[in-house]
Curated annotation (Swiss-Prot):
Similarity comment text for this entry: Belongs to the FKBP-type PPIase family. FKBP2 subfamily.
Organism from which the protein derives: Saccharomyces cerevisiae (strain ATCC 204508 / S288c) (Baker's yeast)
Protein name per UniProt: Peptidyl-prolyl cis-trans isomerase FPR2
Extra facts: Present with 5400 molecules/cell in log phase SD medium.
EC number: 5.2.1.8
UniProt membrane topology term: Peripheral membrane protein
C-alpha cells in the first residue's frame, strides 16, 4: 500500500513541477529474489510487453498488448530509447515496472511527428517476458 501511495505522489508531484529531469522507476510487480533466476543485463536479448503514454495528458500512443506481441531487442546497445535501456536493466522475467522517462532519455526535442510531441516526457508500463542471456 505504501508503495502505491509513493507512486501516486511521485507521479502527481512530477506533473505539478513540470518536466522530468531523471528516469524514475517504480516497481509494479516484484519477483522474489529466490524466483529470479536471470536478470536482464546489457547485451541480453529481451522481450518486453509495454504500454506507452504521454506524462502530461496520459494519452496512450502505443501498446504491444494491443498488437498481441511483445517487442524484442538487445538490451543496452541503443536499439531502443535510453530510458528503456536503463529502466529494463536488472529486471527479472515476470517483473513489471512503471518507467517515467524524461524527454532527454526518450525522443528529445524532435519527438515523433504525429505521435509524440517535441520534448515530451513519457510513461511506460513494462513487463519483462523473456531473457536470452548474452553469456
Amino acid at each position: 500500500m505504501m508503495f502505491n501511495i509513493y507512486l501516486f505522489v511521485t507521479f502527481f508531484s512530477t506533473i505539478l513541477a513540470g518536466s522530468l529531469s531523471d528516469l524514475e522507476i517504480g516497481i509494479i510487480k516484484r519477483i522474489p529474489v529466490e524466483d529470479c533466476l536471470i536478470k536482464a543485463m546489457p547485451g541480453d536479448k529481451v522481450k518486453v510487453h509495454y504500454t506507452g503514454s504521454l506524462l502530461e495528458s496520459g494519452t496512450v500512443f502505443d501498446s504491444s498488448y494491443s498488437r498481441g506481441s511483445p517487442i524484442a531487442f538487445e538490451l543496452g546497445v541503443g536499439r531502443v530509447i535510453k530510458g528503456w535501456d536503463q529502466g529494463v536493466a536488472g529486471m527479472c522475467v515476470g517483473e513489471k515496472r512503471k518507467l517515467q522517462i524524461p524527454s532527454s532519455l526518450a525522443y528529445g526535442e524532435r519527438g515523433v511527428p504525429g505521435v509524440i510531441p517535441p520534448s515530451a516526457d513519457l510513461v511506460f508500463d513494462v513487463e519483462l517476458v523473456d531473457v536470452k542471456s548474452a553469456a
